[in-house]
Amino acid sequence: MKKTRVINKRNLSTMIIGMVTIAVAIVCVFLYVSKPKQTNKSSQSYLNGVDVDKLQKKVGKDFEGTYLLKDYVVYGETLSLYKSKYGSTETDKMQGNNIVLKNVMTDATTSFTFNGSVDSGVDLGTLKEGIYELYTYNHFEKERIYFKDAFKAKAVTTMRRDEKVTSVSFMADKNALKEYGIQFKKNYAFIIVTSQEPNEDIYDVVIDPCGNAMNYFSNTVDVGASTSVLDEASSSLEFAKKVKKELEKKGLKVKILRKENETPGYYGANGRPARAYKTKAKLYLALGASLDENVYAPYMLTSPYTNSGLANTVSYFMEQNGLTLYEARTNTTQENGVLYDSYAESDNGKVLEYELYPQLRETGGKATYAGVYGDEFKNVDYKDAYGMYGLYFSYASAMNSQSVTYYNENADAIAKILVKSIVRYFEI
């Protein structure tokens, strides 16, 4: 007679639990493997899920007037468009023009004014997901923007807002929508905005604690403004950590560009600008000290190619919150404590287009002529790069004990209001 093995209740229960555990594990592995990776998500476009029939009906194909442009610049989160090659004329014909973006699928329009500065133009950080046609006005006539040569620019990833970012693609190509059954007669310009999860390799802000910078010309380390009352290298790093902490509270990803014992300079593959460009940050915040004995409070330097928009915002909120700034400004369009960086001069006294501070010149990419000033050690890899919005914040003078005392007593408050201003300017 064949023997029958009897399974007791405890063994049966153990077997069932084991089978369920294995099944759950298989499902989890399947879900993990099939889950879209971050790189896959970043390759997706708004157009991947668009209603093709609706797109074909709504996108413009023929226009009464068209407007030819030749160049563009990206600075921070701003896209500026030019009638001539950037820098080839003193006043570009686009200056004073409105740039109108029309959302193809919703018909909503957004207008931006270009006043000639690289922080004016299309504010990419404010654009909602969608595909946009670009127009401008020529003698009060609305005309469709196009370029002679087709291109697709490198996508811009905007700063983190509510734990989200957008990927912004700018292109001009008669075949841009060919796969959707749409072709154009000219290389019309489009902007495509796609909502994405943040990529952990992309930062929002980089902070440069000034001082301890390698001078590649003399092969020595420039320690910075170092006196008996303030050491720029250590003070800047300490202040950078305060500012970083406040920025991170706002949901921004921040990188400090040097460690305590490092001495990176402003040129070459391991220089501070190179480190910054690799992060794809939108803001380059330099924190430094002055050697001017007349400076009794903080002030700011900004690129003369900008409107001083960010610096003006910082100045406004500093004074609104009872903080003192050094009484200085370059012109009446600037708030208190805001100065433009100076231009370099040639040997015969001719004013050049290059500004002096590498923290501003070498970090603004094409917009500030990065990589083209001087004869050696140029950052040539970044001369056509998208620029970071540069701000040099001088928190104290190492030659003025009153200034140092004021900074030491108010460093926390200054850091908080500086960050508040950045958040307000970029509408984080």
Question: Model-predicted segments: where are they?
Answer:
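Gram-positive cell-envelope targeting signals
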Residues: 1-48, 81
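Short, compositionally biased P/S/T/A/G/V-rich stretches that sit at domain boundaries
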Residues: 31-79, 84
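Hydrophobic beta-strand residues in large extracellular and virion-surface proteins
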Residues: 79-81, 99-101, 112, 124, ...
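Extended low-complexity, serine/threonine- and proline-enriched intrinsically disordered segments
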Residues: 90-108
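Non-catalytic propeptide/linker segments at domain boundaries
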Residues: 107-210
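Short helix/strand-bridging catalytic loops that position acidic/His residues to coordinate divalent metals
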Residues: 118, 224-230, 297-303
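Active-site histidine-acidic residue metal-binding/catalytic motifs
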Residues: 184-273, 279
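Active-site-proximal helix/loop segments of hydrolytic enzymes
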Residues: 234-428
